[in-house]
């Protein structure tokens, strides 16, 4: 399976993600979702980027696990 580089932007930084071409849109959508969640946490809490990333990861994991139970 071939991989292509997909560029995403999260908190003002650009990342090059290697993924199969057919998954590029999903990766971009995930990055937009993550960026929005990070901004929500940063703006509402005033936390630095590292702490906001940890809280955001915990929140997203909690959402994911709740959805698995349903």
List where the protein language model places each region.
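Compositionally biased, non-globular sequence tracts
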Residues: 24, 48-51
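N-terminal acidic leader/helix
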Residues: 5-14, 18
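N-terminal intrinsically disordered, cationic/polar leader segments
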Residues: 1-5, 68
């Amino acid at each position: 399976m071939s991989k292509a580089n997909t560029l995403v932007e999260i908190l003002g930084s650009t990342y090059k993600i290697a993924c199969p071409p057919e998954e590029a849109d999903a990766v971009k959508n995930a990055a937009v979702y993550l960026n929005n969640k990070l901004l929500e946490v940063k703006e509402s809490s005033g936390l630095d980027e590292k702490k906001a990333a940890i809280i955001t990861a915990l929140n997203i994991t909690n959402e994911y696990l709740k959805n698995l139970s349903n």
